[in-house]
Structures are given as C-alpha cells and as structure tokens.
Amino acid sequence: MTAHLRPVLAGLPVYVPGKTVPGAIKLASNETVFGPLPSVRAAIEHATQSINRYPDNGCLAVKAALARHVSSLSAADFGPEHIAVGCGSVSLCQQLVQITASVGDEVIFGWRSFELYPPQVQVAGATAIQVPLTNHTFDLEAMLAAVTERTRLIIVCDPNNPTSTVVQPEALAEFVRSVPPHILVAIDEAYVEYLRDGTVPDSPHLVRTHSNVVVLRTFSKAYGLAGLRVGYAVGQPDVIAPLDKVYVPFTVSSLAQAAAIASVQAADELLARTDAVVAERGRVSAELRAAGFTVPPSQANFVWLPLEDRTTDFVTQAAKAHIVVRPYGADGVRVTIAAPEENDALLRFARCWITHRDGAR
C-alpha cells in the first residue's frame, strides 16, 4: 500500500539548478569567478579541526559579526538580536513563509522572479499572488493594489532575479510606508553588492523605522561562499525570534560559520571585486544591445535577455557552442557575468546566433 502523502506535493515543481556540463562555460548560476581570499580559506581550514563537533546552533559569533557589519552600513545600531542566520537566504525565505502564512493566507510577489517563491508558498498551504512585472521590474503600485485581508507576506526581490532590474530606493521606501503594518515585507537582497548608480536602498534604515520589514542577504554571490550555504536576515527582534524557532538545527555548518565571519572581516577587500564584475556587466550589456538584443538595465551580476519564443533555440544553440545559460520557460534567458574571456565567448556566440536568426526571417 502506498503511503499517504500531502496532495499538494503532486503539483509541486522540482527546483532545477543551473546545469554544470564538463568542459562548458557555465553562465547559469550567478556564481562569482573569484575563489576565497587566503584569510577566508585559512578560517575554513582551521574550522575543519573541530568538525567532529556540532556547530554553534545559535550562530552567536556570526550574528555578532553581522550586527557590527550592518551597523557600519547604516546610521542605526544593530545587535545580534536583529540577526537570523540560515542555510542560505533561500532557507530564510522559506522560514519567513512558515512564520507568516498558512492555509487561506496569501503571499504577494512580482513575477517573473525567484523561482522558489511559488513552491515555498505552496508547501505552506498558502496562495501565491503573482503580480506581473512592468518593464521587467516589480510594479509596486500593482502589488499594493493586490493586498487583501488575507495578505500575510510581501516579497520584493531587489535586484530582481532573473530580470536583473531594481526598484528605485525612494519608491521602495514609499512602498514600505504604504503597506499595512501587520503585513511583513521581505526585501530579498541576494545581489545587493552589485548595485550602483544611486540604486542602493537604505534597507537597514527601513528595518529600524518599520517593524514589519525584514531584509534577506547571502554570502553565496559577492562573497563567493555558494558551496558553504550561509545567509542572513535583518529584522526587528519580534520577527527574528520566530525565524529562529523554525530554523532546522545545525544546518549552518562550522565551516560556513567560520567562513562567514572571516568574509565579514574582509568585506572591503571582497566587495572591491564586484567593481570588475560591474565593469564587465556594462561591457557585455552594451555589446549585446549593439548586436540587436533587448537587455534591461542590470544591477546584478547577470543580464536578462527577454527572448520569449526564441528562448529554447538560444539555449540549445548555446549548449552546442559549449556555453550553458539559464532558460526561464518562454520568457527569456539569464546569463551570468563571468570572467572576461568567458564573456567574450558568450558575445561571439550571441552575435552569430542573432545574425543567423535575423537572416532566416
């Protein structure tokens, strides 16, 4: 006899990560091309001496380091009680859904956005309210209009994954002011370190001035710790404490905690690396536009190509050229900004592909 499982799981999509193909250029997972700093590597190596022991379940040293770091980014002071640590920001997002939404409740986010939002809401038994983007960007006015008495959580992915766009800081602040205070607003800032051109929101200030705001960040992208899985949330203690209650014990390993602390201590050196990525982002975007592609203005470490019905062909032909990119149904393709020589290979392929496509019409 087959075990009785939750019916909701039958229609739940399985998360498909970016492909890794031996010998191919991988531009599918928004990973940094930079390896760990020597100081971070040394911290990880030192932590291996005690991996026979469980990690600190409270991540106390990590929280203290992050509280100091976040305080340095804002005029406000933060303590460890304002910080939750999790197995990547994606796990913290799932925890946020767990503490806010259940059967009959609604969670609002723009779409298309991070593809794990819908299944996380579905698993909780809640309803995902997907508000269409406008010009590849979150439509904050439409999201406000979607609020009902059943709304429990609103997620703003900023910069948005996969479209790479950002909402203006003033618009985000006004949006937060307009959301009813009993509804939690989560600002997912996985790519915040790549923001430039005056687009960096003062999200720590929003946390301190609005009790219903929580910010999610990760060490997987700019800090280069994707393989260790550690992220954090910044919020008011009455939000952080419930997050810790639904944290799966010991999921942030000793190695991840040591690497996170060392990375925060070397934040200036690590974040200086993002300048090279931003420069390449500008070059790749400009050359793709010159070749005839539509490329929304990116504020992340990737670009978005809204190819619609041409998506499958682009992805298939790119794979034949030993380049792996990330397709999103019939919407488009996300392409990671990588090392200059890898970006050059992508540009050569893209020019060839669009010339062939245009010539075939």
Curated annotation (Swiss-Prot):
Gene3D superfamilies per UniProt:
Aspartate Aminotransferase, domain 1, Type I PLP-dependent aspartate aminotransferase-like (Major domain)
> At what positions is N6-(pyridoxal phosphate)lysine found?
221
Indicate the secretion signal residues.
Answer: none
Task: Kindly list the cofactors needed.
Answer: pyridoxal 5'-phosphate
Q: Name one GO molecular function term.
A: histidinol-phosphate transaminase activity
- Per the UniProt entry, the Enzyme Commission number(s) are 2.6.1.57
User: What are the transmembrane regions?
Assistant: none
> What Gene Ontology terms for biological process does this UniProt record contain?
L-histidine biosynthetic process
Q: Which reaction does it catalyse?
A: an aromatic L-alpha-amino acid + 2-oxoglutarate = an aromatic oxo-acid + L-glutamate
Q: Which SUPFAM superfamilies does UniProt cross-reference here?
A: PLP-dependent transferases
**Keyword list, A-Z:** Aminotransferase, Pyridoxal phosphate, Transferase
How would you classify this enzyme at the top EC level?
Answer: transferase
Oligomeric form and interacting partners: Homodimer.
What's this protein's function? Aminotransferase that catalyzes the conversion of aromatic amino acids and 2-oxoglutarate into corresponding aromatic oxo acids and L-glutamate.
Family per record: Belongs to the class-II pyridoxal-phosphate-dependent aminotransferase family.
- Any idea what this protein is called? Aromatic amino acid aminotransferase
